[in-house]
Structure formats: structure tokens, C-alpha cells
């Protein structure tokens, strides 16, 4: 996959990533920012918009905003502290809530497009 400079896709994704990073910087709670990102990803993926704008929002904004590595670091700390129940609860809840958030974003976008 090459960089699509001709259609400004590279620059649009970079702009989305910049905005996503700023948004992520303002939200300190990993769980919340990941749920918001999942909701937005489901919403944006369901919109009938040009591919380059969808890439801007999904890859740039949502990709930059969500924090898989921060979440893994948080889980590792829970394990090191011996908080096994909290580790398991956190692991399961973010996965289940993330899928639910994507589904809700998808449903919301479809209702707006109807």
C-alpha cells in the first residue's frame, strides 16, 4: 500500500491522527477513551462518505485516539500487583463494551442515514 499524496489522503489521515492524539491527551481514563473510540469507529464506518474521509476518521482519528498499548500496560500493572480479579474484569469488560460500542455507533449512524 503506497502513500496516496495525489488525493491528499496521507495528509487527511495525518490531520485525523493529530486531532485524535489531542483528544486522547485530554482524556485520562483509558477505558473511557477506548469506548468512545470504538463507538466513533462503528459510527464512521457506517457512514456513506468518500473512502479518503472514512480513512481520515477511522484510521487517523480513531486509530490515534484509542490506546491499546496503554491498556496492555495497565493490565500488566494489575497482574504485577496481584490484582487478578480486577485484571480479569478489566480484560473482559473492555472487550465486551468495545464490541457493544462499535455496534451502537453503527446503529446510530444507520438511523441517521435512514
UniProtKB/Swiss-Prot annotation:
Coiled coil: none annotated. GO terms for cellular component: plasma membrane. Its main location: membrane. It is a multi-pass membrane protein. The chain crosses the membrane at residues 3-23, 30-50, 55-75, 87-107. It catalyses: fluoride(in) = fluoride(out). One of its GO terms (biological process) is cellular detoxification of fluoride. It comes from the Bacteria. Na(+) binds at residues 63, 66. It is found in: Cell inner membrane. GO terms for molecular function: fluoride channel activity; metal ion binding. The keyword Transmembrane applies. It holds the Pfam family CRCB. Na(+) is not transported, but it plays an essential structural role and its presence is essential for fluoride channel function. Keywords: Cell inner membrane, Cell membrane, Ion channel, Ion transport, Membrane, Metal-binding, Sodium, Transmembrane, Transmembrane helix, Transport. The keyword NADP does not apply. InterPro entries: FluC (IPR003691). Belongs to the fluoride channel Fluc/FEX (TC 1.A.43) family. Fluoride-specific ion channel. Important for reducing fluoride concentration in the cell, thus reducing its toxicity. This is Fluoride-specific ion channel FluC 1.
Amino acid at each position: 500500500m503506497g502513500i496516496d499524496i495525489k488525493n491528499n489522503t496521507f495528509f487527511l489521515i495525518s490531520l485525523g491522527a493529530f486531532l485524535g492524539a489531542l483528544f486522547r491527551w485530554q482524556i485520562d481514563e483509558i477505558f473511557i477513551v477506548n469506548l468512545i473510540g470504538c463507538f466513533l469507529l462503528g459510527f464512521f464506518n457506517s457512514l456513506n462518505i468518500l473512502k479518503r474521509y472514512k480513512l481520515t476518521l477511522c484510521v487517523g482519528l480513531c486509530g490515534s485516539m484509542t490506546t491499546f498499548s496503554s491498556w496492555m500496560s495497565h493490565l500488566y500493572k494489575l497482574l504485577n500487583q496481584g490484582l487478578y480479579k480486577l485484571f480479569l474484569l478489566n480484560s473482559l469488560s473492555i472487550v465486551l463494551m468495545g464490541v457493544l460500542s462499535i455496534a451502537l455507533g453503527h446503529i446510530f449512524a444507520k438511523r441517521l442515514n435512514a
